[in-house]
Amino acid sequence: MSFSHLGLSDKVIAAVAASGYKAPTPIQDQAIPHVLARRDVLGIAQTGTGKTAAFTLPMLTMLEKGRARARMPRTLILEPTRELAAQVEESFAKYGANHKLNVALIIGGVSFDDQDQKLMRGVDVLIATPGRLLDHFERGRLLLSGVELLVIDEADRMLDMGFIPDIERICKLVPFTRQTLFFTATMPAEIRRITEQFLSNPVRVEVARPATTVATTTQLLARSGREPHDKRDTLRRLIRSAEGLKNAIIFCNRKRDVATLFRSLQRHGFSAQALHGDMDQSARTAALEQFRKGEVTLLVASDVAARGLDIPDVSHIYNFDVPIHADDYVHRIGRTGRAGRSGTAITIVAGSNDAKA
């Protein structure tokens, strides 16, 4: 099986080959022909299944005809976080290497003026977080009446983050004749309601969920006292005694705990950075680059901020808080033990907690 049978253009197939990919993933194989046939698609798939290319590749093929007009994007992709939006932009840069398309990223933490200039030039692909998109719309800087295709990605995370009212508003602002691609890892009742309201006779594409953890990751539990300072002390002892610790991501359930733990680790002499939703974009980008380059050893993060991040070689994961959802546990520890490397994931369980995973 290869990409050539999916109906993609020669330019796209050449870019995929240049990127080193030879065969489509199941979500790509199932979704791409329906996208090219202009059908609405409901894709149930998690991050890591190749779903981003399942919409970027056919979009590139479809956008080879036509031109963008000022302030009127031809296609719109909604992402829950700035980092996911930036990664989709990178996907268009990689697979669109043979195209001359204007792609704009509209996210918080970046100057309105810079984004406004991009919109004025005309945009083929607009990738945005819901809040910043509506900010531009309300300022009169953006018209959504020319959107031919709408992608709503990570819809269940949108629900977790309280974005569903924004999503509903945006769906009503774009033409009802547009094509809609809707991706979610789970289908709670509220998400099902949204799909029934805004998708037209969609093709449902579902791939098996990678709901198991990899064999190359050692999973451990560590008991601690109930108080936050007890957990911080336990974490410090675990880090100091860890064998082969190259770097580590430490997960907290709440962004305020991310900031508190980060400051505590720094006070105790650890090389650490934080990643949470209240940081502006430049600070988040700088934190990630420091971690990727090995300039800091520890990255303290929330689930939402770390969703979809591509950091290939992480030796240790620490769950400072027991994750609320089992899926979050799988996502968290999936950051280590990649590509055949060994990894270690340790969950700290306070006296009053029960491990959920």
Each predicted region: which residue ranges?
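Conserved helicase RecA-like core
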Residues: S2-A357
